[in-house]
């Protein structure tokens, strides 16, 4: 009898839990973790499983039937495409960012290996490519990373001399430093857009969480 009652209580509790699956750009890691914890103070039964990675990779996962409630990418063009092809209900820009050139503190030369995200899948890499196409630097060889946080890791670990990352990522630097923040005229607007998957079974809770995020900047 006790076992039956315990199982009943577990099922009852689970039925009232609010579990969302959120696919988000790697650069959103700290932002999302912080705001999920804040939201839990309002909604104690709220739970989120984060799937972080390159925006292009996350987009493909959704297109291939991946299980997701909310998708939050660093390239609005990806989100517009998802909306037009009916993978998401709508999309809305709620954050913006800038690009920065960083270097390992041990680097003394202006020449070296420059890490950027793979522009085919990583918006930060695509924005970086726009900057490089306009500035035409001749002093770098290139290495491509799976997401912008991998770029940061390459530079921090000395596996690359320089890297181009989002300005918000530079808060995590320990062994590296900012060389410059690029003028926004050198690249397309860096806009983070969020939306609810058409396939989501938790749309009401997803909308509530997105409304909460709208009032939250990077800080």
Located regions from the model:
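Exported/periplasmic ABC-transporter solute-binding proteins
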Residues: 17-38, 42, 56, 64, ...
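Hydrophobic h-region of N-terminal signal peptides that target proteins for export
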Residues: 5-17
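Polybasic, low-complexity, intrinsically disordered segments
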Residues: 13, 41-47
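Central regulatory/effector-binding core of bacterial HTH transcription factors
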Residues: 45-62
